[in-house]
Amino acid sequence: MVSPENTNWLSDYPLIEGAFSDQNPTFPWQIDGSATVSVEVDGFLCDADVIKEPSSRKRIKTESCTGSNSKACREKQRRDRLNDKFTELSSVLEPGRTPKTDKVAIINDAIRMVNQARDEAQKLKDLNSSLQEKIKELKDEKNELRDEKQKLKVEKERIDQQLKAIKTQPQPQPCFLPNPQTLSQAQAPGSKLVPFTTYPGFAMWQFMPPAAVDTSQDHVLRPPVA
């Protein structure tokens, strides 16, 4: 092994230099150790750089490939998640059936379902509004019926009070009126009196009792005036 500190190692061996000069006197053997070694060392260093260069390039390329692979993996994962979402949406739109794989068809089904739900919600909203109006009308009618019932109740109480007042008043005694036929028979057949028509009954004085009409005891009870 040659130490890197002593690059001119051939100059340290003079015997070898002399032997080479004795055997071949005509051929000048010049040893320039520093140049040769420097060339060899430089060549070795250059080769080392050349060797290191491709490895570094390969390393850079590998790192770039690794980055691109991770990006592709992330993109693939994102697409897989998106496909899972579409599959879930298809199963929700059509439960009990095989999920679709066509994304356009799934989106069209979702749009149709949303529009249908929106129309149904609008119909229910209109129905709710009409029911609210009917409830308001029924409440007003109920209030009117309650007021009318209260008025009828007050009117009934007033009529009952009037009937009670009429029942408590004293009734007049019925008067005796002769029969019109009896009056016509009492008249003489040859009389020239015109028969009078009877009038409706009205209150008259009652007849006096017989005891009050008896005059047999007048001379005792009422002496004659002198």
Curated annotation (Swiss-Prot):
Subunit composition and interactions: Homodimer. Interacts with BTS and BHLH47/PYE.
Principal cellular location given in the protein's record: nucleus
Protein name according to UniProt: Transcription factor bHLH115
Gene Ontology MF terms: DNA binding; DNA-binding transcription factor activity; protein dimerization activity
Organism: Arabidopsis thaliana (Mouse-ear cress)
Presence of keyword Metal-binding: no
GO biological process: intracellular iron ion homeostasis
SUPFAM superfamilies: HLH, helix-loop-helix DNA-binding domain
UniProt-annotated location(s): Nucleus
Pfam family, one: HLH
Gene Ontology CC terms: nucleus
UniProt KW keywords: DNA-binding, Nucleus, Transcription, Transcription regulation
Signal peptide start-end: none
Ranges where the bHLH domain occurs: 66-117
Transmembrane segments: none
